[in-house]
Curated annotation (Swiss-Prot):
This is Transmembrane protein 176A. InterPro entries: CD20-like (IPR007237), TMEM176A/TMEM176B (IPR009281). Signal peptide: none annotated. It is found in: Membrane. The modification Phosphoserine is found at residue 42. The chain crosses the membrane at residues 65-85, 92-112, 122-142, 204-224. It comes from the Eukaryota. It is a multi-pass membrane protein.
Amino acid sequence: MSTDMGTADVGEVDPEAPQPTNIEVHIHQESVLAKLLLAGCSFLRVPASASTQSQGSSRVLVASWVVQIVLGILSVVLGGILYICHYLAMNTQGAPFWTGIVAMLAGAVAFLQKKRGGTCWALMRILLVLASFCTAVAAIVIGSREFNNYWYYLRDDVCKSDTSYRWSTMPSITPVPEEANRIGLCKYYTSMLKTLLISLQAMLLGVWVLLLLASLIPVCVYLWKRFFTKAETEKKLLGAAVI
């Protein structure tokens, strides 16, 4: 009986002998270490969201440069059309031309600075951005001040008959009904031309407003990136403190 009991005890103890090992504790320690290593790597590594935000801001800047170049061309073209029509007093000051040229230079230099880099290109880009902002503001002020001034050759007496300038002894060649029809048709086309020129001036003012907004986009993107970077840094510090 005692021998059987001994063998029975040995048989009961043998299966339980390998159980009190340190495998579970060792695995738990490795998992904590792995978490710490992953947390450190994620703290040092640039997050995917930050890279995505950087790409988005870069695309916005490129779009603003393209918009500046296109709007600069439109400003020069519209200014040339209005100058041919002798329409605005601001054409004598050259507002559409120097505003458009500065905007085109700002966009082109921004592309060159992004491609080549360098301190000189960066300084030139900053100066042209400031110049584009100032010229857009000045052009808007000049254009809004001269919006209702019609300084062109289509005056109110352009459709009047030239018989008043003749001597009274000279007979009238054109009959009165035909002369009235001619004056009415002349006034109709003149009013259409005035509406067209006013529309062109409104388009030019809109181009300058868009140029003003486009010149402010780099500043807004810079401030937004600073705010985003600060928020991400604070989030990382809070995560490291919790770990």
